């Protein structure tokens, strides 16, 4: 199926949301020296590729100072570290997966490499989720990004786990409707998006709710699917990726955009969490966004 309007709204909103958290709120930890380790438990990596995982998820991808590659030694690289950039013409096929905190390469590089790099780490992650709220809150095992100075991947078995890492916000498209706007087929698409925020302390949860409560009456440029900056492994397709530059370019060229009309923030209090089997010590919040996008639709 070709990407439809709702797909574009959600993916564009994700980019805006993540930029708000990482750049405006500065929910990042800078200059983390990462070591990447091979895992054969990668359920989403085919046999002709290998994945090496770091102890962290997610990496910050937004900005002009994001590393374009990693340092590799061992195998055909020899005993000294060589800097390998993500480049379509590079024989390693290196791709940096900023979402999973890993590098994916062609299987021919081997499984005994030493890989390192310096990446900024998000302290609040952002995900687009396919799960319903019930599945997300009641049937999902969350991994805490840091617990007793032990990274989450050191506290579980297996590097290839696809578990969500919190603190995090989970974005979903809840509902929409078209309303007549003007003659000639112009309609106003009202989109209702929700962010479920899960954190392990009230400071983080209150900060995220406050940040977005004050983000109403803001424009979110609609980015075409082919211009979405991330590829299949959540690698940057054409580095560097700078959302602020994309935002300014789109808005100055009168690109189609969604206007955030209203934002409502609520919290799920501990008194009800015990009855609903929500993970212990987790704080839950909801942010509801009402978006308006006047546009021409196909009848």
Please report, for each region that a protein language model flagged, where it lies by residue.
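Compact, glycine/acidic-enriched structural inserts
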Residues: 204, 214, 218-232
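Beta-strand elements of well-folded, non-transmembrane domains
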Residues: 119-123, 175-177, 195-203, 290-297
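Intrinsically disordered, low-complexity acidic Ser/Thr-rich regulatory segments
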Residues: 121-164, 243-256, 263
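Short, solvent-exposed beta-alpha or beta-beta edge segments that form flexible loop/patches at the rim
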Residues: 145-209, 269-278
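Beta-strand secondary-structure signal
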Residues: 114-116, 190-196, 286-290
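Surface-exposed intrinsically disordered loops and tails
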Residues: 73-76, 87-92, 134, 143-144, ...
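Short, charged interaction patches at domain edges and termini
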Residues: 1-31, 160-162, 174-189, 239-299
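Extended beta-strand solenoid/passenger and fiber regions
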Residues: 2-93, 99-114, 118-135
């Amino acid at each position: 199926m070709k990407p439809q309007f709702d797909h574009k709204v959600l993916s564009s909103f994700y980019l805006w949301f993540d930029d708000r958290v990482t750049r405006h709120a500065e929910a990042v930890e800078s200059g983390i020296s990462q070591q990447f380790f091979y895992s054969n438990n990668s359920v989403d990596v085919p046999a002709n590729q290998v994945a090496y995982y770091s102890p962290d998820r997610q990496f910050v991808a937004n900005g002009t100072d994001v590393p374009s590659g990693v340092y590799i030694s061992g195998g055909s690289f020899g005993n000294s570290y060589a800097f390998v950039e993500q480049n379509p013409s590079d024989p390693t096929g290196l791709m940096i997966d900023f979402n999973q905190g890993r590098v994916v390469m062609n299987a021919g590089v081997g499984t005994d490499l030493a890989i390192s790099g310096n990446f900024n780490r998000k302290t609040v992650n952002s995900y687009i989720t396919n799960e319903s709220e019930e599945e997300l809150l009641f049937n999902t095992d969350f991994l805490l990004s840091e617990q007793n100075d032990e990274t989450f991947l050191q506290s579980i078995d297996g590097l290839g786990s696809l578990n969500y890492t919190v603190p995090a916000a989970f974005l979903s498209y809840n509902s929409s409707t078209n309303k007549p706007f003007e003659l000639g087929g112009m309609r106003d698409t009202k989109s209702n998006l929700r962010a479920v925020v899960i954190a392990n302390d009230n400071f983080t949860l209150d900060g995220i709710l406050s940040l977005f409560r004050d983000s109403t009456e803001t424009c979110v440029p609609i980015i075409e699917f082919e211009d979405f900056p991330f590829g299949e492994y959540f690698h940057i397709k054409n580095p560097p990726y700078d959302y602020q530059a994309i935002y300014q370019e789109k808005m100055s060229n009168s690109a189609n955009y969604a206007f955030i009309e209203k934002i409502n923030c609520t919290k799920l209090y501990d008194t009800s969490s015990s009855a609903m089997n929500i993970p212990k010590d987790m704080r839950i919040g909801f942010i509801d966004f009402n978006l308006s996008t006047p546009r021409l639709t196909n009848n």
